[in-house]
Amino acid sequence: MASQDRGRDRSSRRLTKKRKDIGRDTRGLSLDIPERFKDGDDAQEDVTAPKRSDAMSMNQSIFSIIARAGGQSQVDLGTMQEVDSGDSDDDGKGKTLHDRLDGAARLSRLRTANDFRPPQEDSRAEKIGSGKHRRALSENKLLRSLPKLKISSRKDVRSDGQHTDQMSSSQFLPPRPSTETPSETHKRGDALKGKARATTGDEIHVEKQRKSERRGGQGSSVGLAQSRGPVSLATRIQQIFEFEHAEEVISEYPCWLLQSILLQGYMYITQKHICFYAYIPKKHHDVSKTGYLYKRGRSKYNRYWFILRGDVLSYYTNPAELYFPRNRINLQYAISAEVVENKKKGEYETIFTVTTDERTYQFKADSAASAKEWVKSIQKVIFRTHNEGNSVKISMPIRNVIEIEESSILDFADTVKVRVVDNGETFAIDEYFFSFFNRGQDALNVLRIMINDNEHHQVSTENQVNPTPITAPLKTSNRHSLVVSPIVPDDTPRIKENVRATLSPLPNPNVGRSSISDISARSSTDVPRKSWDVRRSMDASRALRRSSHEVRRSFSGGRSEKLTKSRAPDRSPLSPAADTESATLSLDPGTESSAAIQSMDESSASASQILNRSDVFRAPAIHSAGVSHSERPQQAARHSQDTTRSSGADQHLQLLVRPSKQTNTSLLPASTEAEEDTDPSQTLPRLSNSSSALQEIASYPLQKASGIAGFLRMRSKEMGSLLATESMGYYEKVSGMLAGGRKHYNTADGLEPHDQIHGIEDDDDAAKAADNFREHFAFPESEILQSSFFASLQRMLPNYGKIYISGRYFCFRSLMPTSKTKIILPMKDIENVNKEKGFRMGYHGLAIVIRGHEELFFEFSKAEYRDECAITVLRILENTKYIEEASSSSGVDSDDEAAKAEHDLLQQAREQSDTHEQIDVSEIARAADHDRIPLIFDDPLASFVDFKPPEPLTIVCLTIGSRGDVQPYISLCKELLKEGHKARIATHAEFEPWVRKHGIDFAPVDGDPAELMRICVEHGMFTYGFIKEANSKFRGWLDDVCSSSWRACQGADVLIESPSTMAGIHVAEALEIPYFRAFTMPWSRTRAYPHAFSVLENKMGGGYNNMTYQLFDKLFWTAISAQVNKWRRRELGLQNTSQSKMQANLRPFLYNFSPHVVPPPLDWPDWIRVTGYWFLDEGDTYQPPADLAAFITQARKDEKKLVYVGFGSIVIDDPAALTKTVVDSVLKADVRCVLSKGWSDRLATKDASKPEIPLPPEIFQIQAAPHDWLFKQMDAAVHHGGSGTTGASLRAGIPTIIKPFFGDQFFFAQRVEDMGVGIWLKKVNTSVFSRALWEATNSQRMIIKAKVLGQKIRKDNGPQVAIQTIYRELDRARTLVKKHVKQDDEQTDEFEEDWTMIEEGQDVDVSAHHFEAQSPLVGMNQDAPRTGGGSLVLGSMVMKGAQKRNSESAYRD
């Protein structure tokens, strides 16, 4: 393989020949590659290399001598979590109700609910879920193909560590050969797409449970299939709210639910229910608001740039440095956002706070209006994240409604307050506010009529009995502890149905009163509520550290549930036991602890309430030191995902309760007993006293310092009472560093039962490490730690720390005393891992390739640790990234689609109703804005703006180069013609027939592309040799290109140019028209990728990548500036320009490659858009020759793999040698080949139609065929790596082998290899080429990755995205147009030009820049630029410079 050959080639520079041969022999057939593919004598040859001794490719050009320039930057990603310095982040800790809760205690606050599905539907969903579970990992072909972790001796490590440094993932993680038939392989490959993505370790069971819940727990996905006939509104409401029977709809009203926001929806009043429904699509990645704010630190406010994107509020020290977020606030855990009332009169309220379940953040805006806008935006996000799912549903049984009354909470609408009994257990009372902007009185009258005769109202009227029940001392419920339960009076009607809602109502104003009768009137937090799957309210007590999309919410029924036996008793923040940090202290199970009786709104309880509790006067019981409150990872997974519910009769909590003297045992339910899995032995001390244990260990000889470190680390909990907490933290860090190495906390996925793994930890260490891991990175209990490694993050200086790997995250935490760096990198953002040489002698490097971001470099002390880390990450990537469910890759997407379908169906049914009326939303919005109430609209298209220009435009596309450079513009222009515009392509004359065949106007551009290609191949793109020959031979060629481009663009309204043309930006300036750029390779400055012309074999990091763009721009402009400026003065009538004046980096840019192939870097501004490939599909009408069709059919019949080989119209010195190598490689790999031999078509001295050597029957030669048809017939493709050809082969979903020759081909070869969907050939010879062919056609890992990528690319619509981007950016492009005024005062012009040149800091002779008088061409005004009318003064020039600098702010040179 190419990467294998590259590894040996690079090793040869530092190893002797003997060591290299040993490396080959020791590796041997460990890659499961047949014996015949071992390297031959030609392994170091390259038949495509130029024969000239002075030839220099771009990989050996000037960029290669600038190694690791700028060092490795401080990487942070969007996910970097860095503990702030003391001056900005410590303030506010300890101010909330939850700052003393650990992760387990927070999780125990989670109150799950009964599933709303009927019992028979439960069983049916369970059967469906079990039937759709993925196969066991041992049966998974993709995972089974992964190699076993090899147990190597130290000697093996020393012998193999060096030559494996440069191995790619395809080499150190190869597939095992499959024994299946090709047909079985094909079927099983297709079957993988239908399987749900597997996470690793113990999370597999969790994932299975989640999937089954998603299928059955969501009302929108049950019984909502589209029917052929119209469905009545009553039937649709029955389906959505899951009523037992269809109920007649008495009335429906558009209304707004009033909570922290004003939510638009509809109220439906049926015979038995009052229902509310609103659709709120979640915006996971949209930027809601940006701007500067002050954030409160310890002693002062610090100013940062804030970005509210999705549900994360990030802030930056420098807005231009998107790689270095100061910190991120996850609003999924936020509780409230509010403006702080200013106590000083006359001063504006500019301070606002955001409260999470851990702390309170304080911010200060520049104005009161800005503060309110930020609060409104954050409140919207909080509401979205706290609502269960993508729709708000409230179903209130009419018989539960106690009171309907008007409210004056809003001045601009009629507001109705509905008080309703929540459930039959506690008789808690909820309040909901609904605002009506139309027909409010009608709604109020109907509601009053409907509830006038309900049983609650009658009882309250006749008996004058307070509906709030008397409470009993003890009663079990679905809380994790014992709670107060009401004793229902005999004359109180029984609640047969509970209120069901996906969000919590507003807090009741009676919560804080001391009367015990007011306990029932609570803020919906004392008593557990049933929601969709996992209930989370807007109150502080209900905020939990878990993601809003982590578990699917489901609309709920009853109020009681049965907890799993793995759950621990809850603990309140005010619990006496919560005051200590020791894990050995807990409450006696028999006491009425604060967790057992106290509500989570206890912060507002009065002194009499607190003293009224009997357990206040008792000391907390202390359990034995051996009992740990933390759970095993398996238990934690069940704990975090236990959403099992029942919809039948009440099922009480099973708790181990020891009655005390103060407790009336007669009130305990008879069913209360010990849990089934309670082990009596666990209540006894498992370990002796820490000091005696130390004496015992001291009796043994101390052989290793790491042994003591490990022992002390195991006893850290027991020694917590002896050492100070802060000192213990330093001790744990040091002891961990002393132990070093790596640790695995469970068996890796995909291993066979007899496989072994280094460093496996026992259960005690694994549990403690998992707890520490979740504490460091604030992960939920469901996040299971799998492995950890000690390594150094390579920056300017190595940053020593610890790598943590779980099923979903790759994390790093610095252990350096002065560093607080943390990295939290989702596994889904990792593309690949590459082994590299270490930066330091004796260290071994690992590069993490990340989507849209520069690589992360880590150094390990041993190659063994580096290899295990790489294999661990790759196994997780295989599980989570490439085994996708057919319907959706994540639950979030499927939830969004289900909610949208539900919304559409309900809207269709509502439109059939006569009561449906339109409301003027603008009036409501203005009124709400006056009161500063944030709005959420029901219509997801309410914010859509049509950017399409009213008049058709003449759009010219200017490009030079090969056929691959022209083809994307033909596809774009065809779509522009459909939009009603006039399209024209300006390029080389040889492409005119092809362009005009598609009905597109054409204009010729001079220049011979064959000559340009020749010097590119011989010298490399824009190397010193290229520039030298271009200056000596192609000055006239550049003049012809510029002049012909100027003529071809006359009459254009918009110009789209490939920047390689070099003339377009100047033509657009002269014509004063909007200018866009479009290209097939990265041309905009970024740290994620190097410039396409400066790709090296090694990953050099973000500093090098960014430098290549600056250096290239400087060299490129220096080479052409003199000639271009001369042409500007002579033909365009423009003055000289420079890089800063052109503002090229501020121009809108369209990249016509897929975002799945080249993910947009995080540091690209929003005017740069990766649109997707602009494919030109010509295969629909293509009829293949009969002999080609017969060749393909015969290959399938013979069960032989088909490969395409074609390197385009390249120029090489020895085409015969290349042909012979291709023939020999095809025969050796035992495949069939379709050959497109164009490597001697240009500048050849003989007829290229005659083959240099005879072709065997296994090879079929073609002249041309559409790629979109041909690649569908192939199993793999080999080509030169042009953007269009690469896109075509990747869209077909086949592995791609690339042998780059010049230009951007090296870049796409690297991308294909990084994604794991192909191979980058460094050399072409029989040994390397044949091995690459065999791997591309037999590696199931590569085949499946390519297939998945092809599916994603086929979903793109690049031309349409490009057109919409043009529409959106057209106004911005117009603002960059420089207006010119006709010259009429030569002295003023000279004077103005002189000022401009002084601004650039250049000494020039003013007399040397007189313009040559030229007659303007038709349609062109020969103007000269002016900075203003009349005479100039120094002040005007200063203002001009200031405005210019502001316009080029963050993305200029």
Swiss-Prot record:
Q: Which reaction does it catalyse?
A: a sterol + UDP-alpha-D-glucose = a sterol 3-beta-D-glucoside + UDP + H(+); ergosterol + UDP-alpha-D-glucose = ergosteryl 3-beta-D-glucoside + UDP + H(+)
> Which terms in the Gene Ontology molecular function aspect does this entry carry?
sterol 3-beta-glucosyltransferase activity; UDP-glycosyltransferase activity
Return one Gene Ontology term, BP aspect: lipid glycosylation
Q: Which SUPFAM superfamilies match?
A: PH domain-like (SSF50729), UDP-Glycosyltransferase/glycogen phosphorylase (SSF53756)
Q: Which Pfam families match?
A: EryCIII-like_C (PF06722), Glyco_transf_28 (PF03033), GRAM (PF02893), PH (PF00169)
Regions of biased composition (Low complexity) lie at 513-524
Domains: entry comment: The GRAM and PH domains are required for the localization of ATG26 to the preautophagosomal structure (PAS) and are involved in autophagy.
Q: Where is this region: Disordered?
A: 1-57, 81-226, 500-608, 624-688
Role of this protein:
Sterol glycosyltransferase responsible for the glycosylation of ergosterol to form ergosterol-glucoside.
Give its E.C. classification number.
2.4.1.-, 2.4.1.173
Record key words, sorted: Autophagy, Cytoplasm, Glycosyltransferase, Lipid biosynthesis, Lipid metabolism, Membrane, Protein transport, Repeat, Steroid biosynthesis, Steroid metabolism, Sterol biosynthesis, Sterol metabolism, Transferase, Transport
Write down the CDD domains for this protein, in alphabetical order: GT1_Gtf-like (cd03784), PH-GRAM1_AGT26 (cd13215), PH-GRAM2_AGT26 (cd13216)
Q: What positions does the domain GRAM occupy?
A: 235-282, 771-837
Q: How does it sit in the membrane?
A: Peripheral membrane protein
Entry's family note: Belongs to the glycosyltransferase 28 family.
Residue span(s) of domain PH: 286-383
Feature: compositional bias, Basic and acidic residues: 1-12, 22-41, 91-103, 112-129, 153-163, 183-193, 200-216, 527-539, 547-570
| List of residues binding UDP-alpha-D-glucose | S962, R963, D965, A1265, H1267, H1280, S1283, G1284, T1285, D1304, Q1305
Q: Which InterPro entries match?
A: ATG26_PH_GRAM1, ATG26_PH_GRAM2, EryCIII-like_C, Glycosyltransferase_28, GlycoTrans_28_N, GRAM, PH-like_dom_sf, PH_domain
Protein name as it appears in the record: Sterol 3-beta-glucosyltransferase
